[in-house]
Each structure stands twice: as structure tokens, then as C-alpha cells.
């Protein structure tokens, strides 16, 4: 149990730092859409999709790696709370269209990236 807790801790910290770096680099590029948060959510959705696809086929993988990558890293990287706050900020500024676009792109994009990862993994392992 301690190994699993440490894996979540290490993965979560690493994912959080990655999210912060993405936000620092990309959020200033566009005033209405926080591109760093979007990138974090899309990358995290892709990684978790690939992870779940891989772990479902590779049943001998140590559970420590599973929680390090999915619960830890992807949990720290992706951020529904920051995304939600940014949508509220856009609404408070009267930017309804940008707020709706942000919701649409984050949600649909995350679903699409997860599905893409599953598809790519399946295609690459089909023999």
C-alpha cells in the first residue's frame, strides 16, 4: 500500500509541475482560451487513454506503474478545477461565446484524445 501511495504522490507531483509549466508557457498566448490548460487536458486524456489500453493488454504490469501514470501523473496533469474556474472567469467578463467554446474544445477534445490513444494502441499492436 505504501508503494502505491508513493507512486500516486510522485506521479501527481510530476503531473502538476508539467501542468504549471504548460500554463506558464501557453496561457499568455491567447487571452480568451487558456491554451496551457487545454494542452494539459488533451495530453492527459491521450496519456490516460494509451495507459488504459496498454494496461488492459499487459496484465503483468506492476500496479505501482498503473497508479503512477493514471491516477498520479494524469490526475496531476489534467485539471477540471482550473478549467472550471477559467470558464467562470470568461463568463464574468461577459465572454459567453469564448466560455462555451472553451467548454466544447476541452470536453470534446479530451474525449477525442482518449479515443485516439485507444485506437492508435490497438492499431499498433494488431498483428
From Swiss-Prot:
One of its GO terms (molecular function) is fluoride channel activity. Na(+) binds at residues 75, 78. The gene is fluC. Na(+) is not transported, but it plays an essential structural role and its presence is essential for fluoride channel function. This is Fluoride-specific ion channel FluC. It is found in: Cell inner membrane. Keywords: Cell inner membrane, Cell membrane, Ion channel, Ion transport, Membrane, Metal-binding, Sodium, Transmembrane, Transmembrane helix, Transport. InterPro entries: FluC. It catalyses: fluoride(in) = fluoride(out). Its main location: membrane. It holds the Pfam family CRCB. Belongs to the fluoride channel Fluc/FEX (TC 1.A.43) family. The chain crosses the membrane at residues 4-24, 35-55, 71-91, 103-123. Disulfide bonds: none annotated. GO terms for biological process: cellular detoxification of fluoride.
Amino acid at each position: 500500500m505504501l508503494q502505491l501511495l508513493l507512486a500516486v504522490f510522485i506521479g501527481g507531483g510530476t503531473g502538476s509541475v508539467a501542468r504549471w509549466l504548460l500554463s506558464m508557457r501557453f496561457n499568455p498566448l491567447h487571452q480568451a482560451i487558456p491554451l496551457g490548460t487545454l494542452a494539459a487536458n488533451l495530453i492527459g486524456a491521450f496519456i490516460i487513454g494509451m495507459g488504459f489500453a496498454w494496461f488492459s493488454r499487459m496484465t503483468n504490469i506492476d500496479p505501482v506503474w498503473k497508479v503512477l501514470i493514471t491516477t498520479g501523473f494524469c490526475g496531476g496533469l489534467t485539471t477540471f478545477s482550473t478549467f472550471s474556474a477559467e470558464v467562470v472567469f470568461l463568463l464574468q467578463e461577459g465572454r459567453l461565446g469564448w466560455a462555451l467554446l472553451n467548454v466544447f474544445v476541452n470536453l470534446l477534445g479530451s474525449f477525442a484524445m482518449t479515443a485516439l490513444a485507444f485506437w492508435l494502441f490497438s492499431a499498433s499492436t494488431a498483428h
